[in-house]
């Protein structure tokens, strides 16, 4: 942004993944003015971030609105399922879909794998199937399917289905009083970029009342009533209260936004209608069903319909819903709200127009580095045994940094590369700082950091060591030379690009990069990771999407990692 001539304030969003206190200091060094905190933080962790926040940087935190199941900036689910990157704001929301687990799920997975093998698919989903085929899938209790870390997937247990990853809306409501007076926290954030004026007006009004009247019980009651009229989803406080953390999903419930106003009926001519539970006004906006149903659609109300009256719905014949489908009110233009909008529109039209100027500055030229051959890396999910602890000539064996991996023999630590996790939470920072220091003292000099801000865990002396290598890992989501140039200035010596890049970008970026680059060639790459845990989904057991794509979940530390049941493999390319 600065290279393009922008001189205003720079805000780092939740996609930047600043999840631990040291990250704020690094953001300050890069010139950031404002940081949006992750939604997964508790009130105690928000205080930790505030205490560590340097002068010149202010904080924002979310208080209301939609929740993503996966950690922001660490979700690739939409890319896997829809070919559209959630990191670029084009998420197709696969987490909102109905998934099933148990019963014949594992058998279906096995059959799909066999079909893929017969069709010659040896690179994508067939790779998993080839491993699954070697297992005995029909024997109860037998472990089937390699998870990539020495464990195997369990066969299906009882059959179940639900929206296991579709989060309710975050709502701090009366608890926002605990956020007042926190140093550096200057802004409350309401998620609602795709919402209508009704939602925006009601949520903002409610939280303004709560902010201005923190100890007034009548104001509290009024604000709660206004929030109930905002037409959002069922709400949750998620992890905000550390003593009452909750998994913010209701697998058996409806987690789409809107107020239930009726159910579909079908008249004698086959036309759909509803008898609304509340009066409907002209310009109200309705949603029929939920997003992953074939008949899902949205439509306006064209005339006033009293409670219990009949409203015929003009829906294309190919989208005619079945009787009993729920209908929701998702937006409303009350007379008073329309008047307010008109007043603001008039004020906007009276304001003088700003003159715009062309940007005259040019981005700094990035000087490409000379070709440098770096060793291939093989990242192990489990601790090496026997001969695996010996140094390899053709590649660098790597381990994820953890208390368990750091406890291996001191004599072999320097033979491995050490990968830091994609997410470090505030209560984990001190632990990882100690682990990094311990590994360094035992001779470790090759580190892969899966967030740029993790350089804050290393001392200046470490970063200046000529024998050390610091690689920006694939979870840094690197996609252009300008980003690589910033990483070089931060002290990185190499980088691994984002797996989301297309083939053209993969081939073009190394020619322009100021650092040696790598890419993820093969392995179990997650669709996402979450701090919320699972409710209903059993770990290490396959579950399936509506189109029978198979996945499985595994717990690592505080986070649940979700993997597709096929390995990424670009070896042939």
Regions found by a protein language model. Name each.
Residues 1-22, 36-187, 194-486, 490-573:
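Active-site pocket-lining/capping segments in soluble small-molecule metabolic enzymes
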Residues 33:
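Long, basic N-terminal domains or extensions that often function
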């Amino acid at each position: 942004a600065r290279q393009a001539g922008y001189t205003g304030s720079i805000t780092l969003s939740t996609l930047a993944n600043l999840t631990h206190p040291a990250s704020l200091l690094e953001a300050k060094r890069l010139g950031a003015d404002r940081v949006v905190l992750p939604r997964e933080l508790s009130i105690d962790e928000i205080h930790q971030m505030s205490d560590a926040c340097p002068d010149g940087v202010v904080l924002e935190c979310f208080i209301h609105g939609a929740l993503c199941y996966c950690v922001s900036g660490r979700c690739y689910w939409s890319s896997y399922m829809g070919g559209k990157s959630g990191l670029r704001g084009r998420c197709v929301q696969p987490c909102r879909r109905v998934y099933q687990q148990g019963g014949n799920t594992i058998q279906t997975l096995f059959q799909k794998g066999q079909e893929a093998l017969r069709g010659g698919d040896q690179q994508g989903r067939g790779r998993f199937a080839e491993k699954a085929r070697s297992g005995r899938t029909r024997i109860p209790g037998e472990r089937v399917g390699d998870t990539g870390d020495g464990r195997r997937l369990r066969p299906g247990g009882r059959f179940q289905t639900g929206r296991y990853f579709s989060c309710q809306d975050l709502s701090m409501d009366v608890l926002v009083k605990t956020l007042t007076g926190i140093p550096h926290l200057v802004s409350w954030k309401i998620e609602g970029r795709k919402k209508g004026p009704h939602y925006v007006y009601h949520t903002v009004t409610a939280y303004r009342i709560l902010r201005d009247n923190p100890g007034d019980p009548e104001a509290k009651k009024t604000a709660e009533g206004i929030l109930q009229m905002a037409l959002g989803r069922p709400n949750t406080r998620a992890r905000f209260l550390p003593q009452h953390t909750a998994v913010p999903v209701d697998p058996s419930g409806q987690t789409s936004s809107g107020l239930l106003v009726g159910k579909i009926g079908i008249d004698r001519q086959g036309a759909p209608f509803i008898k609304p539970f509340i009066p409907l006004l002209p310009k109200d906006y309705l949603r029929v069903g939920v997003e992953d149903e074939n008949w899902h659609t949205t439509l306006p109300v064209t005339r006033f319909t009293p409670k219990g009256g009949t409203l015929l719905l003009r829906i294309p014949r190919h989208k005619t819903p079945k009787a009993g489908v729920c209908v929701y009110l998702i937006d409303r233009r009350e007379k008073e709200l329309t008047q307010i909008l008109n007043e603001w529109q008039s004020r906007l039209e009276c304001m003088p127009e700003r003159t715009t100027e062309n940007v005259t500055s040019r981005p700094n030229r990035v000087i490409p580095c000379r070709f440098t051959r770096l060793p291939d890396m093989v990242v192990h999910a489990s601790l090496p045994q026997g001969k695996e602890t010996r140094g390899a000539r053709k590649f660098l064996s790597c381990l994820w940094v953890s208390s368990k991996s750091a406890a291996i023999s001191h004599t072999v630590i320097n033979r491995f590369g050490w990968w830091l996790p994609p997410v470090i939470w505030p209560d984990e920072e001190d632990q990882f700082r100690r682990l990094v220091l311990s590994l360094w003292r035992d001779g470790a000099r090759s580190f892969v950091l899966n967030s740029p801000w993790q350089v804050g865990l290393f001392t200046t002396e470490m970063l200046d060591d000529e024998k050390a290598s610091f690689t920006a890992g694939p979870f840094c989501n690197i996609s252009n030379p300008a980003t690589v140039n910033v990483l070089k200035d931060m002290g990185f010596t190499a980088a691994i690009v984002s797996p989301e890049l297309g083939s053209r970008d993969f081939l073009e970026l190394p020619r322009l990069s100021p650092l040696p680059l790598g890419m993820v060639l093969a392995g179990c790459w997650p669709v996402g990771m979450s701090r919320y845990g699972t409710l209903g989904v059993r770990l290490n057991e396959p579950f399936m999407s509506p189109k029978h794509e198979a996945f499985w979940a595994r717990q690592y530390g505080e986070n649940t990692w979700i993997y597709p049941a096929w390995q990424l493999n670009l070896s042939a390319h």
